[in-house]
Amino acid sequence: MAAASGLIPTRVLLVVEEKAQLELLQVFSGRGDAAHSHLLEVHLGQEAQLNHGVLACADGVASLFAQCAVEQEPRSTYTFTSVVQGWSLGRIEPRVIQVDGQASTTLKGLAVADAEQQLAVHTSVCFEGPDGELDQLQKCLAAGRSHTIFNGAINVPVSYTHLRAHET
């Protein structure tokens, strides 16, 4: 999606049924004074798989807020990969809830900022059942007077054991 100026809002609801597999690539392109606000809501059925990519590039002036809200049923797999570059102000926010456990989540991202750009990646993964897995790797490159922020929250109730969470 690209525009010269103004607000560009989108909201998508995606239901991936039991045992289904899907690959999704979202591309956000920002030019001029455009303000992007995007929400993707996903429900993954049991044993469903979603490979989700976000490529967000801008000219240094536009702003971006992109949120992914994902619910995972048992034995589902969600893989999220993002590359964000060139936004004056940008925020990517994947939020995942493993509803009854036994799900696998992979979050990987790269944020590239220059000049006075400010980019933030805020992730949240909530384990609401046992035997969940998380693999997370977030990287950033910042030059000039730019800033990049990563904030990763993992919510694990004390009663659940056998969780594997790796965050870098």
Protein language model annotation of sequence segments:
Residues 1-167:
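Conserved beta-strand/loop scaffold segments within soluble protein domains that form the structured core
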